[in-house]
Protein backbone atom coordinates (compact mmCIF):
# COMPACT_ATOMS: atom_id res chain seq x y z
CA UNK A 1 0.00 0.00 0.00
CA UNK A 2 1.35 3.42 -0.94
CA UNK A 3 1.57 6.27 1.54
CA UNK A 4 0.73 9.27 -0.65
CA UNK A 5 -2.87 10.47 -0.95
CA UNK A 6 -3.43 13.56 -3.07
CA UNK A 7 -5.95 16.03 -1.69
CA UNK A 8 -4.81 19.02 -3.74
CA UNK A 9 -2.63 19.67 -6.82
CA UNK A 10 0.80 18.02 -6.84
CA UNK A 11 2.40 21.47 -6.93
CA UNK A 12 1.15 22.02 -3.37
CA UNK A 13 3.46 19.25 -2.10
CA UNK A 14 7.02 20.03 -1.03
CA UNK A 15 9.91 18.39 -2.90
CA UNK A 16 10.13 15.55 -0.38
CA UNK A 17 6.51 14.55 -0.83
CA UNK A 18 6.69 15.06 -4.60
CA UNK A 19 9.76 12.85 -4.79
CA UNK A 20 7.94 10.14 -2.87
CA UNK A 21 4.84 10.42 -5.06
CA UNK A 22 6.84 10.08 -8.28
CA UNK A 23 8.93 7.23 -6.86
CA UNK A 24 5.68 5.41 -6.09
CA UNK A 25 4.32 6.13 -9.58
CA UNK A 26 7.56 4.93 -11.20
CA UNK A 27 7.16 1.68 -9.25
CA UNK A 28 3.46 1.41 -10.16
CA UNK A 29 4.44 1.73 -13.84
CA UNK A 30 5.84 -1.83 -13.66
CA UNK A 31 2.44 -3.25 -12.76
CA UNK A 32 -0.24 -4.64 -15.06
CA UNK A 33 -3.02 -2.20 -15.87
CA UNK A 34 -5.63 -3.58 -13.46
CA UNK A 35 -3.26 -3.47 -10.51
CA UNK A 36 -1.71 -0.16 -11.58
CA UNK A 37 -5.14 1.44 -11.87
CA UNK A 38 -6.08 0.31 -8.38
CA UNK A 39 -2.80 1.63 -6.94
CA UNK A 40 -3.00 4.95 -8.81
CA UNK A 41 -6.56 5.56 -7.66
CA UNK A 42 -5.48 4.95 -4.06
CA UNK A 43 -3.02 7.84 -4.56
CA UNK A 44 -5.72 10.19 -5.82
CA UNK A 45 -5.75 9.77 -9.60
CA UNK A 46 -9.11 9.30 -11.29
CA UNK A 47 -8.14 8.02 -14.74
CA UNK A 48 -5.35 5.75 -15.94
CA UNK A 49 -4.25 5.16 -19.53
CA UNK A 50 -1.78 2.40 -20.45
CA UNK A 51 0.40 2.70 -23.55
CA UNK A 52 1.87 -0.57 -24.85
CA UNK A 53 3.09 -0.18 -28.40
CA UNK A 54 5.58 -2.66 -29.88
CA UNK A 55 7.05 -3.32 -26.43
CA UNK A 56 7.38 0.34 -25.35
CA UNK A 57 5.28 0.96 -22.26
CA UNK A 58 4.14 3.93 -20.20
CA UNK A 59 1.22 5.11 -18.11
CA UNK A 60 -0.74 8.31 -17.96
CA UNK A 61 -2.13 9.07 -14.49
CA UNK A 62 -4.59 11.94 -14.40
CA UNK A 63 -7.01 13.84 -12.19
CA UNK A 64 -8.65 17.26 -12.48
CA UNK A 65 -5.40 19.08 -11.64
CA UNK A 66 -2.51 16.97 -12.91
CA UNK A 67 -1.34 14.86 -15.85
CA UNK A 68 1.54 12.47 -15.05
CA UNK A 69 3.53 10.49 -17.61
CA UNK A 70 5.27 7.52 -15.97
CA UNK A 71 7.42 5.40 -18.30
CA UNK A 72 8.06 1.75 -17.51
CA UNK A 73 11.65 0.64 -16.97
CA UNK A 74 13.61 -2.40 -18.06
CA UNK A 75 12.04 -5.78 -17.44
CA UNK A 76 14.73 -8.52 -17.60
CA UNK A 77 12.26 -10.96 -19.19
CA UNK A 78 11.47 -8.56 -22.04
CA UNK A 79 13.91 -8.89 -24.95
CA UNK A 80 12.65 -5.59 -26.38
CA UNK A 81 13.79 -3.74 -23.24
CA UNK A 82 17.22 -5.39 -23.23
CA UNK A 83 17.66 -4.57 -26.93
CA UNK A 84 16.78 -0.93 -26.25
CA UNK A 85 19.30 -0.71 -23.40
CA UNK A 86 22.10 -2.19 -25.50
CA UNK A 87 21.53 -0.07 -28.61
CA UNK A 88 23.77 2.71 -27.32
CA UNK A 89 24.74 4.32 -30.62
CA UNK A 90 24.01 8.06 -30.68
CA UNK A 91 21.29 9.33 -32.98
CA UNK A 92 19.92 12.78 -33.73
CA UNK A 93 17.35 13.92 -31.16
CA UNK A 94 14.01 15.42 -32.19
CA UNK A 95 14.99 18.60 -30.32
CA UNK A 96 18.76 19.28 -30.19
CA UNK A 97 22.01 17.30 -30.33
CA UNK A 98 22.20 13.50 -29.92
CA UNK A 99 20.57 10.87 -27.72
CA UNK A 100 20.87 7.12 -27.09
CA UNK A 101 19.31 5.38 -30.11
CA UNK A 102 17.65 2.58 -28.12
CA UNK A 103 15.94 5.00 -25.74
CA UNK A 104 14.78 7.26 -28.58
CA UNK A 105 13.37 4.27 -30.49
CA UNK A 106 11.20 3.34 -27.50
CA UNK A 107 9.86 6.89 -27.20
CA UNK A 108 9.20 7.03 -30.95
CA UNK A 109 6.81 4.08 -30.60
CA UNK A 110 4.51 5.73 -28.06
CA UNK A 111 5.02 9.38 -29.02
CA UNK A 112 2.22 9.84 -31.60
CA UNK A 113 -0.44 8.51 -29.20
CA UNK A 114 1.03 10.31 -26.22
CA UNK A 115 1.30 13.56 -28.15
CA UNK A 116 -2.40 13.38 -29.06
CA UNK A 117 -3.36 12.71 -25.44
CA UNK A 118 -1.32 15.66 -24.21
CA UNK A 119 -2.93 18.01 -26.71
CA UNK A 120 -6.42 16.72 -25.85
CA UNK A 121 -6.24 16.32 -22.06
CA UNK A 122 -3.42 18.43 -20.67
CA UNK A 123 -4.58 21.92 -21.59
CA UNK A 124 -5.93 22.72 -18.11
CA UNK A 125 -3.65 20.39 -16.15
CA UNK A 126 -0.04 20.52 -14.98
CA UNK A 127 2.20 17.95 -16.69
CA UNK A 128 4.78 15.90 -14.75
CA UNK A 129 7.23 13.23 -15.92
CA UNK A 130 8.83 10.29 -14.09
CA UNK A 131 10.41 6.88 -14.58
CA UNK A 132 12.96 4.34 -13.38
CA UNK A 133 15.84 2.80 -15.36
CA UNK A 134 14.88 2.63 -19.06
CA UNK A 135 11.70 4.43 -18.02
CA UNK A 136 13.78 7.30 -16.63
CA UNK A 137 15.57 7.67 -19.96
CA UNK A 138 12.26 7.60 -21.84
CA UNK A 139 10.72 10.16 -19.48
CA UNK A 140 13.69 12.47 -20.06
CA UNK A 141 13.24 12.34 -23.84
CA UNK A 142 9.46 12.75 -23.56
CA UNK A 143 9.92 15.80 -21.31
CA UNK A 144 12.37 17.29 -23.81
CA UNK A 145 9.96 16.80 -26.70
CA UNK A 146 7.00 18.14 -24.76
CA UNK A 147 8.70 21.43 -24.09
CA UNK A 148 11.05 21.65 -27.04
CA UNK A 149 9.32 20.44 -30.18
CA UNK A 150 5.73 21.66 -29.78
CA UNK A 151 3.70 24.00 -27.62
CA UNK A 152 3.16 21.96 -24.46
CA UNK A 153 0.89 23.56 -21.86
CA UNK A 154 1.88 23.71 -18.21
CA UNK A 155 5.00 21.48 -18.00
CA UNK A 156 6.28 21.19 -14.43
CA UNK A 157 9.10 18.84 -13.38
CA UNK A 158 10.92 15.61 -14.24
CA UNK A 159 11.76 12.98 -11.58
CA UNK A 160 14.07 10.10 -12.53
CA UNK A 161 15.29 7.15 -10.47
CA UNK A 162 18.33 5.08 -11.43
CA UNK A 163 18.57 6.80 -14.81
CA UNK A 164 21.25 5.97 -17.37
CA UNK A 165 22.92 8.77 -19.29
CA UNK A 166 20.51 9.76 -22.05
CA UNK A 167 22.12 12.27 -24.38
CA UNK A 168 25.11 14.40 -25.28
CA UNK A 169 26.05 17.54 -23.36
CA UNK A 170 24.06 19.96 -25.52
CA UNK A 171 20.93 17.80 -25.22
CA UNK A 172 21.02 17.54 -21.43
CA UNK A 173 21.91 21.21 -21.02
CA UNK A 174 18.87 22.16 -23.10
CA UNK A 175 16.59 20.29 -20.69
CA UNK A 176 13.84 22.87 -20.28
CA UNK A 177 12.31 21.93 -16.91
CA UNK A 178 13.50 21.21 -13.39
CA UNK A 179 14.91 17.68 -13.16
CA UNK A 180 15.45 15.80 -9.89
CA UNK A 181 17.77 12.88 -10.69
CA UNK A 182 17.79 10.27 -7.93
CA UNK A 183 20.87 8.05 -7.56
CA UNK A 184 21.11 5.23 -5.01
CA UNK A 185 24.77 4.80 -4.03
CA UNK A 186 26.32 2.23 -6.43
CA UNK A 187 23.35 1.85 -8.80
CA UNK A 188 25.12 0.48 -11.89
CA UNK A 189 22.61 1.80 -14.41
CA UNK A 190 23.52 5.40 -13.55
CA UNK A 191 27.04 4.72 -14.89
CA UNK A 192 26.02 3.79 -18.44
CA UNK A 193 26.41 4.51 -21.31
CA UNK A 194 30.01 5.51 -20.66
CA UNK A 195 30.80 9.22 -20.64
CA UNK A 196 33.64 8.44 -23.07
CA UNK A 197 30.93 7.90 -25.72
CA UNK A 198 29.82 11.50 -25.26
CA UNK A 199 26.84 10.86 -22.97
CA UNK A 200 26.25 13.10 -19.96
CA UNK A 201 23.98 13.38 -16.93
CA UNK A 202 22.05 16.48 -16.02
CA UNK A 203 19.53 17.57 -13.43
CA UNK A 204 19.91 18.05 -9.70
CA UNK A 205 21.53 14.92 -8.28
CA UNK A 206 19.61 13.57 -5.29
CA UNK A 207 22.09 11.14 -3.79
CA UNK A 208 21.26 8.27 -1.42
CA UNK A 209 24.36 7.18 0.47
CA UNK A 210 25.49 3.73 1.62
CA UNK A 211 22.74 3.61 4.25
CA UNK A 212 20.05 5.05 1.97
CA UNK A 213 20.05 8.54 3.45
CA UNK A 214 19.96 11.73 1.35
CA UNK A 215 23.28 13.54 1.35
CA UNK A 216 24.93 16.39 -0.55
CA UNK A 217 28.49 15.23 -1.28
CA UNK A 218 31.52 16.24 -3.29
CA UNK A 219 32.82 13.87 -5.97
CA UNK A 220 35.52 12.60 -3.60
CA UNK A 221 33.01 12.04 -0.81
CA UNK A 222 30.74 10.09 -3.18
CA UNK A 223 33.68 7.96 -4.31
CA UNK A 224 34.50 7.02 -0.73
CA UNK A 225 30.84 6.38 0.01
CA UNK A 226 30.53 4.10 -3.02
CA UNK A 227 33.56 2.10 -1.88
CA UNK A 228 31.97 1.83 1.57
CA UNK A 229 28.72 0.65 0.00
CA UNK A 230 30.46 -1.91 -2.18
CA UNK A 231 32.33 -3.35 0.82
CA UNK A 232 29.14 -3.40 2.88
CA UNK A 233 27.41 -5.29 0.07
CA UNK A 234 30.20 -7.87 -0.09
CA UNK A 235 29.87 -8.50 3.64
CA UNK A 236 26.12 -8.97 3.16
CA UNK A 237 26.65 -11.38 0.26
CA UNK A 238 25.17 -9.17 -2.44
CA UNK A 239 26.37 -7.18 -5.43
CA UNK A 240 25.73 -3.58 -4.41
CA UNK A 241 25.77 -2.26 -7.98
CA UNK A 242 22.71 -4.34 -8.85
CA UNK A 243 20.81 -4.32 -5.55
CA UNK A 244 21.03 -0.51 -5.42
CA UNK A 245 19.08 -0.33 -8.70
CA UNK A 246 15.91 -1.79 -7.16
CA UNK A 247 12.97 0.63 -7.42
CA UNK A 248 11.61 -0.61 -4.09
CA UNK A 249 14.85 0.56 -2.46
CA UNK A 250 14.38 4.05 -3.86
CA UNK A 251 10.78 4.14 -2.60
CA UNK A 252 11.57 2.98 0.94
CA UNK A 253 14.52 5.35 1.37
CA UNK A 254 12.68 8.36 -0.06
CA UNK A 255 9.72 7.57 2.19
CA UNK A 256 11.94 7.87 5.27
CA UNK A 257 13.39 11.15 3.98
CA UNK A 258 9.89 12.52 3.34
CA UNK A 259 8.99 11.71 6.95
CA UNK A 260 12.09 13.45 8.31
CA UNK A 261 13.68 10.13 9.31
CA UNK A 262 16.86 8.27 8.39
CA UNK A 263 18.14 4.72 8.14
CA UNK A 264 20.54 3.69 10.93
CA UNK A 265 24.21 3.63 9.97
CA UNK A 266 25.18 0.06 10.79
Show where each model-derived region lies.
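Non-catalytic, mobile gating and regulatory segments of ester bond hydrolases
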Residues: 1-130, 134-266
Amino acid sequence: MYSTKLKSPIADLDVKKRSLLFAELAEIAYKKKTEATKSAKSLGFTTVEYYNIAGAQAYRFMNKDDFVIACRGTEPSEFNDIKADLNALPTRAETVSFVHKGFKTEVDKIWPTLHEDIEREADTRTIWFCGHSLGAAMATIVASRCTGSFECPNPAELYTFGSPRVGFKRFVQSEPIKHYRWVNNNDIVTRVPMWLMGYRHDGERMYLNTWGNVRKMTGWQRFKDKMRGMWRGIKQGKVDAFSDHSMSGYVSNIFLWSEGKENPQN
